[in-house]
Swiss-Prot record:
Record's protein name: Flagellar hook-associated protein 2
A GO-annotated cellular component: bacterial-type flagellum hook
GO biological process, one term: cell adhesion
Ranges in a coiled coil: 354-419
Biological role: Required for the morphogenesis and for the elongation of the flagellar filament by facilitating polymerization of the flagellin monomers at the tip of growing filament. Forms a capping structure, which prevents flagellin subunits (transported through the central channel of the flagellum) from leaking out without polymerization at the distal end.
Subunit structure: Homopentamer.
Gene: fliD
Family label: Belongs to the FliD family.
InterPro entries the UniProt entry points to: Flagellin_hook_IN_motif, FliD, FliD_C, FliD_N
Keywords, in A-Z order: Bacterial flagellum, Coiled coil, Secreted
Disulphide-bonded residues: none
Location in or out of the cell: Secreted; Bacterial flagellum
């Protein structure tokens, strides 16, 4: 700052002077707001800690008040690798043995090794899982990966998963069910021309193949010589018995395969080869067919049979001895009016359809030889030869030949499919889980969880019981340990509240500093209400369970709670089922503690009300702060304007004085 004439200042530090004036005005007011805000924030935090410690106790009491809080069961198992269990409150305490015979598993089939460059289609794959099915259209020249994607991406797929395994010899298609259980087996059939690789993706059991063959034979028989209703019934019985025999062979083969797979040494060498299996199936089918005669009704094989005379006839009737040779027996069945007395004449004079057919075939054979010679010499083509041969036949004969050819073609196709089956095979059977409970009850499920195996108990199966080990033991009992821990948590929660309230409302003996809630009546009231509940008697409880002291829970000289574990364990062991009468209900101990705490921490409780009041004070301080800021801003502007005006006036005065000095020659 420079001095002009007569010692007047030529300039002022206006900003510095304004800042000091405003600061002197702001500081005491700002300090009051800040101190009050700090006290409020400290109180809000203290009440929050107090409320949280009380709510912890309240939440524990809410659990105790649940209807089945003391009905929880504890489950132990002797072999967790075989079975585990969970129990609801409905489970009856006791010990049970569980023998796991088999685990549930999903069905899985696999193809033979396929050509890695194979082109499939055109055709269709019909795939079913249990009682649900879908059809996949396979375009011509499709790759194996295209089929896999088609199966897995089909929207109507009920739960079949396809994949490719790259064997050392080539790719294999694996198709498996996503659902376990015997009712969820996979079936696959292919609709394609013979020789199409798509036929390699069919899956048929031996039983199915036998039944298909018998069906084709029956259809062929119908085309050539339709069966009577009675013959159809007998044929159905025969087919059923043959199918049953094939199924038994299927089962024996499957058992052989499983045994071979489980054998430690020589498994491959002991397995049956394909030829032996086919021979076994054929023998079984032949034996079954030989017994089919017994299915013919008595009225069809016993002369003079009636309902009234059936008893006598069945007792006295002897099957007649065969009187004719094989050719005669074969012919006798077709001779109208045949009997033993007239057999010679009838058999000699009657020409059966079979004999007529033989003559026709001989004639056809001669003509066939002539036609073949003409074809070899080039006089006619095979098509012309066939047309010429058929033209010589009557319409009835042509129709008959066409029927025979059609039946023979169908039968050849069925026989070829049976003998040369090259489709998919089963690598894992579909089966339910199965256990034996307590050695008497057999239980099963389509998965490895058996619900309500024992009332209120679910079993989770993990492995089969070792043949050399005893069944797994499952023990179910009341969960006393959990209730004991809950009571310990309640006592710890109260002690935590007590320590927190003492810290917030007391005076630190080392520093002499009072807590943020020192002298607050709410803290004293909270502890007083809880102590009143703790010392009260629960009238609805049994005689020896009416107060906390009978659980061994008492108040120490310092004001905390402590547990006499000998008394607590005695009550848990002797009166476990009666604990709910003390803690539960609308008049029980747990509800009383809840109500006492709710009166403090609830929406209208004393602590909540105080917190609300403090929050409102915070809002008021915010208003005070904004008001102070506005006043200080206004003060700063006014003060700055005054000093600016003073500086202008001073400058003018100095200018005038300087002019006067110059005029006086000074």
């Amino acid at each position: 700052m420079s001095l002009g004439p007569m010692g007047m200042n030529t300039g002022f530090d206006i900003n510095g002077m304004v800042s000091k004036i405003v600061s002197a005005e702001r500081v005491p007011k700002q300090q009051r707001i800040d101190n009050e805000r700090t006290n409020i924030d400290t109180s809000i935090s203290a009440y929050g800690r107090l409320r949280e410690s009380l709510d912890t106790m309240k939440n524990l009491m809410t659990q105790f008040r649940q209807e089945k809080a003391f009905a929880v069961r504890k489950v132990d198992t002797s072999n967790e690798q075989v079975v585990s269990a969970t129990a609801t409150t409905e489970a009856i305490a006791g010990n049970y043995s569980v023998d796991v015979l088999q685990l549930a598993q999903s069905h899985k089939i696999a193809s033979e090794v396929l050509d890695k460059d194979a082109k499939f289609g055109p055709g269709k794959l019909h795939i079913s899982l249990g009682d649900k099915s879908f059809t996949l259209d396979v375009q011509g020249n499709s790759k194996l990966v295209d089929i896999v994607r088609g199966i897995n991406g089909e929207k109507s797929n009920p739960g079949v998963r396809a994949s490719i395994i790259n064997d050392v010899e080539g790719p294999r298609l694996i198709v498996a069910s996503n659902v376990s259980g015997k009712d969820h087996s996979v079936k696959m059939s292919a609709q394609a021309e013979p020789g199409n690789p798509l036929k390699q993706l069919e899956y048929k059991t031996l039983e199915q193949r036998v039944r298909d063959l018998e069906k084709a034979r029956a259809q062929a028989q119908q085309l050539i010589a339709p069966l009577t209703p009675e013959q159809q019934k007998v044929a159905a019985k025969v087919a059923e018995k043959i199918g049953d025999a094939a199924r038994l062979v299927d089962q024996e083969v499957a058992q052989e395969i499983r045994s071979a797979a489980q054998s430690a040494q020589g498994a491959a060498g002991e397995a049956l080869n394909a030829g032996e299996l086919t021979e076994s199936a054929v023998k079984a089918a032949a034996n079954a067919a030989s017994e089919a005669k017994k299915y013919i009704r008595p009225e069809d094989r016993i002369p003079g049979w009636t309902e009234t005379a059936s008893g006598t006839l069945l007792d006295s009737y002897w099957e007649p001895e065969e009187e004719l040779d094989a050719q005669g027996q074969k012919k006798a069945a077709d001779v109208p009016g045949w009997s033993n007395t007239a057999s010679g004449t009838l058999l000699d004079s009657y020409v059966t359809p079979q004999e007529a057919q033989q003559k026709l075939e001989q004639k056809l054979a001669q003509e066939k030889a002539q036609i073949e010679a003409a074809i070899r010499s080039g006089k006619m083509t095979p098509e012309e030869a066939k047309a010429q041969a058929r033209a010589k036949l009557s319409p009835e004969e042509r129709a008959y030949i066409e029927q025979v050819e059609k039946a023979q073609a169908a039968l050849n196709a069925a026989q070829s499919a049976f003998d040369g089956y090259g489709g998919m095979t089963e690598v894992q059977s579909a089966q339910d889980s199965m256990v034996v409970l307590d050695g008497v009850a057999t239980l099963s499920s389509n998965n490895n969880i058996i619900e309500n195996a024992i009332e209120g108990v679910n079993l989770t199966l993990k492995g089969k019981t070792d043949r050399n080990q005893p069944p797994a033991e499952i023990g179910i009992e009341y969960d006393r340990e959990r209730v004991r821990n809950d009571i310990e948590q309640f006592v710890a929660a109260y002690n935590q509240f007590f320590q927190t309230s003492k810290e917030l409302a007391g005076v630190d003996p080392r520093t002499g500093q009072a807590g943020p809630l020192a002298g607050d009546s709410i803290v004293r009231s909270a502890d007083s209400r809880l102590k009143t509940v703790f010392s009260s008697s629960i009238e609805q409880a049994p005689e020896n369970l009416k107060s906390l002291t009978e659980f061994g829970i008492t108040t120490t000289r310092q004001g905390t709670l402590e547990i006499n574990y000998a008394m607590l364990d005695r009550q848990l062991n002797n009166n476990f089922t009666k604990l709910g009468e003390f803690f539960g209900g609308n008049q029980g101990f747990a509800k009383r503690v809840e109500d006492a705490i709710s009166s403090m921490t609830g929406v209208t409780g004393s602590i909540r009300t105080r917190e609300k009041s403090l929050n409102e004070q915070t809002y008021r301080l915010d208003d005070d702060q904004r008001s102070l800021d506005r006043r200080m801003e206004s003060l700063e502007k006014r003060t700055h304007a005054k000093f600016s005006a003073m500086q202008d006036a001073t400058s003018k005065m100095q200018s005038q004085l300087a002019g006067m000095m110059n005029a006086l020659g000074g």
